[in-house]
Amino acid sequence: MSRRGTVEEKTAKSDPIYRNRLVNMLVNRILKHGKKSLAYQIIYRAVKKIQQKTETNPLSVLRQAIRGVTPDIAVKARRVGGSTHQVPIEIGSTQGKALAIRWLLWAARKRPGRNMAFKLSSELVDAAKGSGDAIRKKEETHRMAEANRAFAHFR
């Protein structure tokens, strides 16, 4: 029997202003070179811009965007008998949210624009509406999983 204890899963802390875990997850993913205060500034400016654009609660727009981008299934490369297959696997909610945040930031960074806050707010609003590069990435992942459905038994 293993002597290692079970590791309890860490819960994400909430940010100081909105008291929201998703905002803090976003801050931790946008963080570069340990500059957390700059990451908070970018997020809070983006949230203000969302408020100005949509005139609704920006946190609900953020939640809706992340829910829209969160994938249900993904593909994982699995080597079987000398050839590599893309095997579709189901994704849990925590991992799905992490992927959604990663894709949203990737799409925002790819956008042309003035600054990161503007690009992020535009991407979040688009994702909440059901368009944008992050949504396209999710649909592409789902298409890949559907195309490789025959390899699902390799799990």
Swiss-Prot record:
Alphabetic keyword roster: Chloroplast, Plastid, Ribonucleoprotein, Ribosomal protein, RNA-binding, rRNA-binding
GO cellular component terms, A-Z: chloroplast; small ribosomal subunit
Compartments where found: Plastid, Chloroplast
A single BP term in Gene Ontology: translation
Main location: plastid
SUPFAM superfamilies reported in the protein's UniProt record: Ribosomal protein S7 (SSF47973)
Spans through the membrane: none
Signal sequence residues: none
Entries under Pfam families matching the protein: Ribosomal_S7
GO MF entry, a single one: structural constituent of ribosome
UniProt entry tagged with the keyword GTP-binding: no
Function statement: One of the primary rRNA binding proteins, it binds directly to 16S rRNA where it nucleates assembly of the head domain of the 30S subunit.
Record-linked HAMAP family: Ribosomal_uS7_B
Protein's UniProt name: Small ribosomal subunit protein uS7c
Natural source organism: Phytolacca americana
